Amino acid sequence: MTMKTLCLSLIVIGVLILVAVKAEDYVNINSLEEAPEENVNINNLEETPEESRCIQRHRSCRKSSECCGCSVCQCNLFGQNCQCKSGGLIACGKK
């Protein structure tokens, strides 16, 4: 293989891995039965089964451990308006 082919192959593999990681955040089997509310009440999470105790992306949160998958809880400069957002490949697995 030439260097150009090798580099192109590595880029394609990297993109495929990134797409697979991002798809994990969008697919939540528990969410197929019932759509989540716009503003999630943290107290109501305790009444649900263990598997669905996470907040999906773009929903309000208070800490990163509440967010599903590789999402992290990000707030604005003043520590308000916190939402679960994609943490990227680096944040995946860290809570």
From Swiss-Prot:
Q: Which UniProt keywords apply?
A: Amidation, Disulfide bond, Secreted, Signal
**Which residues get removed as pro-piece?**
24-53
Q: Which residues carry this modification: Cysteine amide?
A: 92
The cellular location(s) given in this protein's UniProt record come to: Secreted
Domain note for this entry?
The presence of a 'disulfide through disulfide knot' structurally defines this protein as a knottin.
- Family as reported in the entry's similarity comment: Belongs to the neurotoxin 02 (plectoxin) family. 02 (plectoxin) subfamily.
What does this protein's UniProt record list under function?
Answer: This recombinant (non-amidated) toxin shows insecticidal activity on larvae of the housefly Musca domestica and has no activity on a panel of expressed neuronal receptors and ion channels.
Return the protein name.
Toxin Tbo-IT2
